[in-house]
Amino acid sequence: MAGLRVLLCLGALLARQGSAGLQLLLNPSRANLSVRPNSEVLPGIHPDLEAVAIGEVHDNVTLRCGSASGSRGLVTWYRNDSEPAFLVSFNSSLPPAAPRFSLEDAGALRIEALRLEDDGNYTCQEVLNETHWFPVRLRVASGPAYVEVNISATGTLPNGTLYAARGSQVDFNCCSAAQPPPEVEWWIQTHSIPEFLGKNLSANSFTLMLMSQNLQGNYTCSATNVLSGRQRKVTTELLVYWPPPSAPQCSVEVSSESTTLELACNWDGGYPDPTFLWTEEPGGTIMGNSKLQTLSPAQLLEGKKFKCVGNHILGPESGASCVVKLSSPLLPSQPMRTCFVGGNVTLTCEVSGANPPARIQWLRNLTQPAIQPSSHYIITQQGQSSSLTIHNCSQDLDEGFYYCQAENLVGVRATNIWLSVKEPLNIGGIVGTVVSLLLLGLAVVSGLTLYYSPAFWWKGGSTFRGQDMGDVMVLVDSEEEEEEEEEEEEKEDVAEEVEQETNETEELPKGISKHGHIHRVTALVNGNLDRMGNGFQEFQDDSDGQQSGIVQEDGKPV
């Protein structure tokens, strides 16, 4: 052993004179070998250059001794730990330290079944005319043996695919084990080109706060050994789901053959599509589990109900439902319509309550074919409202009943409208008639006023004739005509007495008649002759008094 140490010291002294700037790159099978100056060597020995070799666990690696090829001198390999450890030599008297170590051509060291503990510094000693030392750095890489991906998704499909609810928070984590620690990267592929998300050593985690539809795709985590370049990756598909925004809508439609009805359950706006279940109500008899359900003729009954239950993967757990009810059309009664000869008229028919929607037709008679649109008949329909416009009305052709018929596969209803066609109105005749009626009414009012209020008309007449306002006038209401006929004889007697008094009055002096007049008005008051006589007597007394006064005044001296 003392002799070996002497040889090592001599070799170190000779190696100091070599070139220090040489770099060597070798690429043996499954190993990379490079040479770097001034690296670690045996204690107390400064080499000219150092090579770096890389191998993987369980693989084989070859470490070359310098850059020379061909025949070599005595070559010996050492492992540089705290103290140099002999591995193998051309000297046959020195057996290898382990069967895994052997020498190849040109003094290269072959190590089989690499282990992690093989990582370290190695030195090749060549003794020919002089001794040379060639240090080699061996790096042993391991893994990555696995890649573990964890995604905190909402749920997992039976095939293992993950899904997350739109708007939720999703955490991503990827880890791997390797020697040295691997470089971990995240990629996402939503379309054709992957997008890089980030990288880190050993593990990589990130969080997406609000999942959206454009974040649905394949997420890939890759772990790469920075020494060996070995890479492992795991790709996980993540789907983004969302439920329909509103409740399902049930409807009934006529089939393409127009012979039966189809139930439709629409619950759109979600992803993926929901599932459906149709039941017959009441009773809950299951009919089918498709979006469209065909009804049999026996099920086309008035008031029949059917229920659709929709289920989405994101809930609600009990599902969302809607109910559809079959019903025949309803038609309100229509009033009579009138059209003038040569004019136009529009008949309107409003249908309500029909499910499915009804087909509306216009007929002149329920046994005749439906009215077809033409220049004479204009038919317009908007939704469940239909209008029939008749142009150039004719009394012979168009007057009569018109039927509005509404029909669906549940039932049929009809209502009739009577159309009366008349001649146009004479406006001039109407105006003349109105004016005549107004004049007639005015005459009647005037006559009634004259009959019941004669004083008003008498005073008016006297004023227009310029009579003296000092005239004496006595008005006595008259009795009804029937009583006048019965008391006609009594009136004649009274008239004779009045005439006598009048004659006496005419004998008064002429001066009296110059300033005053006495008007005689005789009437029968309620057939009471005594009352009338008393009134007349009072009138006579007043007249006598006036006459006496006048005579006295005339007797005065002038």
From Swiss-Prot:
The keyword Lipid metabolism does not apply. The chain crosses the membrane at residues 427-447. It is found in: Membrane. Keywords: Disulfide bond, Glycoprotein, Immunoglobulin domain, Membrane, Repeat, Signal, Transmembrane, Transmembrane helix. InterPro entries: Ig-like_dom, Ig-like_dom_sf, Ig-like_fold, Ig_sub, Ig_sub2, Ig_V-set, Neural/epithelial_adhesion. Residues 1-20 form the signal peptide. Residues 477-506 have a biased composition (Acidic residues). It is a single-pass type I membrane protein. Residues 37-140, 144-235, 248-327, 332-420 form the Ig-like C2-type domain. GO terms for cellular component: membrane; neuron projection. It comes from the Eukaryota. It holds the Pfam family Ig_3. Residues 448-558 are cytoplasmic. Disulfide bonds join 65-124, 174-221, 265-308, 349-404. Glycans are attached at residues 32, 60, 121, 150, 159, 218, 344. Residues 21-426 are extracellular. The keyword NAD does not apply. Residues 477-515, 532-558 are annotated as: Disordered. This is V-set and immunoglobulin domain-containing protein 10. The gene is Vsig10.
